[in-house]
A protein has these predicted regions:
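Conserved GHKL (Bergerat-fold) ATPase module
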Residues: 1-450
Length: 450
């Protein structure tokens, strides 16, 4: 409330001095008590407030029965005068991924409520934030159209975003300290890692700061890891950050990616690969291209180092492993490659001899200029029916008995069945839904009979 509210009432008095006692009533007197604080909580000094004050206010503001995970209270004075009070929930709002989500930040002007339905008060990727913005400089009769173009509000928004990012970074840094701080940060990442990734795609101006916050799974460590942690573990001669995408809940997620044949060569060389198992990773990560980190130099000045991001499920990624082409092996495998190409026809973009496979007979990769099959399927599911079919590149292991055995087979139907199974199993192991599962079963049954 902007103004104090008082309640006036009559209080009876008794001759023994005790209210409500069995003594003789001797009269009454009028009393007046303040029933509110008189000052909006976000306008009060932080030194006057306790955690419980913030927690109770958050529950009233958000209708959340849980206390917030974190709160940030700021008072700015100078060229602009405003107060902000932001809360990070312990759990993601139920409408977080709805197009028609309800904004969580309310706008006040001079402690007078203006709106709680303006999605421009915060960037879309920070839609999980709850709280208050109270400006002293905006007019009270401000309209939605004016809000969208107002430089004062834009400055408050930009400053607030940087403040939130700074708080998130402090939470991340504190996670290496106490168990409580670690649990707090892990809760934050479990709930809001995906919106942060959206920020990488949507908020170019803050991309470097967001890159320090996003977390991924890894083939080298348990739990979450960051780009900074990855480069700290890199081999001295390693030039790239390797990652694999294409999981997602529909495709089997992290478990599917960890079992991918595409990782065999990296495991053999003990090279860490980041596991990016969220559907959004396929969209966001390729736009980053690289990770840049500032490090203190010998002269005290900061130095910048950049590492290129490389997807292991792209054609040509095996060349980065230092595996040299074996011309003799390619010459020997050429008749087999031609048989597979002829059998598969336009189901694939290309068939190649793989340098990355150790144990598996085949794998699929995407052309560098094509989206992944998983991304194409996701876009189609979202209604982009004009999305053309993406044809995979099939890589085969020339040393595997199934592939090598094709050299001595002349039966075209049998070659077609084996080639079809090599492709279908490569799709399945990546968690990709087959267009013709019945055809796969028929081919497999024919091979089992023979």
């Amino acid at each position: 409330m902007a103004f104090p509210i008082y309640l006036t009432y009559e209080e009876k008095e008794y001759d023994d001095g005790n209210q409500g006692s069995s003594g003789t009533e001797k009269g009454s007197k009028t009393k007046t008590d303040r029933i509110n604080s008189g000052t909006a909580l976000w306008r009060r000094a932080k030194s006057e407030l306790k955690d419980d004050d913030y927690y109770e206010f958050y529950k009233q503001l958000s209708h959340d029965s849980d206390a917030p995970l974190h709160y940030i209270h700021t008072r700015a004075e100078g060229t602009m005068e405003y107060s902000t009070l932001f809360f990070i929930p312990k759990k993601a709002p139920s409408d977080l991924y709805n197009v028609d989500y309800k904004p969580g930040v309310k706008l006040y002007v001079k402690r007078v409520f203006i709106t709680d339905d303006d999605k421009d008060l915060m960037p879309v990727w920070l839609r999980f934030v709850r709280g208050i913005i109270d400006s002293e400089d905006l007019p009270l009769n401000v309209s939605r159209e004016i809000l969208q173009q107002n430089k004062i509000l834009l400055n408050i928004k930009n400053t607030s975003v940087k403040k939130l990012l700074s708080e998130f970074k402090q939470m991340a840094d504190a996670a290496s300290g106490t168990d409580e701080a670690k649990e707090k940060w892990e809760t934050f990442i479990e709930q809001f890692n995906r919106p942060l990734k959206e920020g990488l795609y949507q908020d170019f101006g803050n991309r470097d700061a967001i890159q320090e916050l996003v977390r991924f799974k890894s083939t080298a460590v348990e739990g979450w890891t960051s780009f900074a942690d990855y480069v700290s573990r890199m081999k001295s001669d390693q030039k790239h950050i390797y990652y694999i995408t294409g999981g997602g809940a529909v495709s089997g997620g992290e478990k599917t990616l960890r079992a991918s044949p595409l990782l065999e060569a990296y495991r053999a060389k003990e090279i860490e690969v980041l596991i990016m198992d969220d559907e959004i990773d396929d969209l966001v990560i390729p736009t980053l291209h690289s990770y840049r980190k500032e490090t203190p130099g010998a002269d005290g000045k900061s130095e910048s180092q950049t590492w290129e991001l490389k997807a292991v499920n792209r054609s040509g990624a095996d060349e980065e492993l230092g595996e040299k082409k074996n011309k003799a092996a390619e010459k020997e495998a050429k008749p087999v490659i031609e048989k597979i190409k002829k059998a598969l026809g336009d189901r694939v973009k290309e068939v190649k001899l793989s340098r990355r496979l150790h144990d598996s007979p085949s794998c699929i990769v995407a052309d560098e200029n094509d989206p992944s099959i998983q991304m194409a399927q996701m876009l189609k599911a979202m209604g982009q029916t004009s999305m053309p079919d993406v044809k995979p590149i099939l890589e085969v292991n020339g040393d595997h008995p199934i592939v090598a055995g094709l050299k001595d087979i002349d039966d075209e139907e049998r070659i077609a069945d084996i080639a079809g199974v090599l492709l279908d199993q490569a799709l399945l192991v990546e968690g990709i839904k087959l267009n013709d599962p019945a055809g796969f079963v028929k081919r497999l049954n024919r091979l089992l009979v023979k």
